From Swiss-Prot:
UniProt organism field: Pediococcus pentosaceus (strain ATCC 25745 / CCUG 21536 / LMG 10740 / 183-1w)
Protein name: Small ribosomal subunit protein uS15
Example of a GO cellular component annotation carried by this entry: cytosolic small ribosomal subunit
GO biological process, one term: translation
NCBIfam families referenced in this protein's UniProt entry, alphabetically: S15_bact
CDD domains per record: Ribosomal_S15p_S13e
Gene3D superfamilies for this protein: 6.10.250.3130, S15/NS1, RNA-binding (1.10.287.10)
Family: Belongs to the universal ribosomal protein uS15 family.
Keyword Transferase belongs to the record: no
Amino acid sequence: MAISQEKKNEIIAKYARHEGDTGSAEVQIAVLTADINEINEHLRVHRKDFHSQRGLMKKIGHRRNLLAYLRKTDVQRYRDLIKSLGLRR
């Protein structure tokens, strides 16, 4: 259900601000988005998996907090990130 390490490394390489960056808000949001999408696919098949549903809600809340932080600190980075991830319409 969780994303593979290879996919996570690809996401980190794409959104990292510098070499070895795994903790910036952009990287964390991108990894959480991939996790959220993966859990959504799982829940489409397993509708009654309430433990995964709770995990999904926790990840969505964490991503929401990180997005609010990024929007508050650097609006341009926030806009670029949501455009590249396709989060807002």
